[in-house]
């Protein structure tokens, strides 16, 4: 059973108002769950860094107009909005620092968390294993059922298009083998879920009655 602990509830309560745009609130919670699962498999990581970072990583999008926000991450983007991705990282780091200090997180941890958030999308390498898990959790979310539904809504895609787009971004760019295995399993389930054969199973037919 995964639940937010006392520290993470305190962080979440302060972060939530900054995440109430473009489904970032639900995205961050699902990514938190993914991070918790990865932490059980990667003993060298520090949950005191990873979990606050994943809850706070997208708070900076609150400082960007939502329409421009989507243009910055669209699959057909032309690069003219790339500066907004950087802005959300910088502003997210600023917001995260303020929240972490209010919660009373140790200064040494604050510095590590903020460093991860500042560059979590644009930095192509991982600073360390904690950064790798944050990056991977963020990306693996894309191939969850929630992630695919959100991407469909954002960009007007059908289920197959969303799955192909999300799958392309949620494997090769991952840093940990554990996240790659998780992503591959989620993609496999999504593929089976869309098959004609599954649609004709008793349980599916029974559910429609």
Identify what each model region corresponds to.
Residues 42-52, 101-117, 130:
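Acidic/histidine metal-binding catalytic segments
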């Amino acid at each position: 059973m995964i639940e937010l602990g006392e520290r993470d509830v305190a962080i979440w309560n302060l972060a939530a108002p900054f995440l109430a745009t473009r489904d970032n609130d639900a995205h961050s919670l699902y990514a938190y769950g993914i991070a918790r699962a990865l932490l059980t498999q990667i003993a060298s990581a520090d949950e005191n860094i990873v979990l606050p970072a994943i809850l706070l990583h997208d708070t900076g999008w609150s400082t960007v107009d939502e329409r421009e926000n989507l243009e910055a991450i669209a699959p057909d983007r032309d690069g003219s909005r790339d500066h907004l991705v950087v802005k959300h990282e910088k502003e997210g780091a600023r917001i995260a620092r303020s929240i972490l200090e209010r919660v009373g997180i140790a200064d040494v941890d604050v510095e590590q968390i903020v460093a991860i958030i500042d560059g979590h999308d644009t930095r192509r390498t991982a600073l360390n294993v904690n950064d790798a898990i944050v990056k991977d959790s963020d990306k693996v979310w894309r191939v969850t059922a929630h992630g695919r539904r959100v991407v469909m809504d954002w960009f007007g895609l059908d289920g197959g298009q969303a799955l192909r787009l999300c799958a392309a971004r949620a494997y090769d760019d991952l840093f940990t083998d554990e996240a790659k295995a998780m992503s591959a399993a989620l993609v496999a389930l999504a593929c089976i879920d869309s098959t004609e054969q599954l649609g004709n199973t008793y349980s599916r037919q029974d559910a429609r009655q």
